[in-house]
């Protein structure tokens, strides 16, 4: 059974709490074991928590959940883009998948609420698929014909 951690932002917690509940439910449906739920103050802090979980032996992948709501400035764009960039870097650094379940930038509160289930579910599914496909790749060997990992 694959083991995952979930990192969830407490900022806009009315939205991210719902995302967390959907993510937990979907992870269990897919047969994933949730070893840790790590709450952070905001989306900006998500990469720190993800890095701490990815270095653990009892975590095969991490789901990152947050909601970056559009404000009067471009702060939402900065936070969302830098967080996503760092999460990609951490995946490569640790060789473990990270599911991006961060709503925004540019989303209104209403749009974020409409996207809760979709973003949470897709982030969990991405991690589950990548964990399984990475394990599948380790078990395969090229023997003259193309090997499909799916």
From Swiss-Prot:
Residues noted as binding (2S)-2-hydroxy-3-oxobutyl phosphate in the record, renumbered to the chain: 72-73, 115
Source superkingdom: Archaea
Entry binding sites for 5-amino-6-(D-ribitylamino)uracil: 11, 43-45, 67-69, 100
Gene3D superfamilies attached to this UniProt entry: Lumazine/riboflavin synthase
Key words, A-Z: Riboflavin biosynthesis, Transferase
Cross-referenced SUPFAM superfamilies: Lumazine synthase
CC annotations in GO: riboflavin synthase complex
Active-site residues annotated for this sequence: 75
Keyword Transferase: yes
Biological processes, Gene Ontology terms: riboflavin biosynthetic process
Molecular function GO terms recorded: 6,7-dimethyl-8-ribityllumazine synthase activity
HAMAP family: Lumazine_synth (MF_00178)
Family, similarity comment: Belongs to the DMRL synthase family.
Function (record text): Catalyzes the formation of 6,7-dimethyl-8-ribityllumazine by condensation of 5-amino-6-(D-ribitylamino)uracil with 3,4-dihydroxy-2-butanone 4-phosphate. This is the penultimate step in the biosynthesis of riboflavin.
Record's protein name: 6,7-dimethyl-8-ribityllumazine synthase
Gene name linked to the record: ribH
């Amino acid at each position: 059974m694959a083991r995952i951690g979930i990192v969830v932002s407490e900022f806009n917690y009315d939205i991210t709490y719902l995302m967390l509940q959907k993510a937990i439910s979907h992870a269990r449906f897919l047969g994933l074991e949730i070893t840790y739920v790590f709450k952070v103050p905001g989306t900006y802090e998500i990469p720190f928590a993800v890095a701490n979980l990815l270095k653990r032996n009892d975590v095969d992948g991490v789901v990152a959940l947050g909601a970056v709501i559009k404000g009067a400035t471009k702060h939402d764009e900065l936070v969302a883009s830098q967080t996503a960039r760092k999460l990609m870097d951490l995946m490569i650094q640790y060789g473990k998948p990270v599911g991006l379940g961060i709503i925004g930038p540019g989303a209104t509160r209403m749009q974020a609420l409409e996207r809760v289930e979709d973003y949470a579910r897709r982030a969990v599914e991405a991690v589950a698929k990548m964990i399984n496909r990475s394990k599948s790749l380790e078990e395969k060997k090229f023997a003259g014909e193309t090997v499909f990992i799916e």
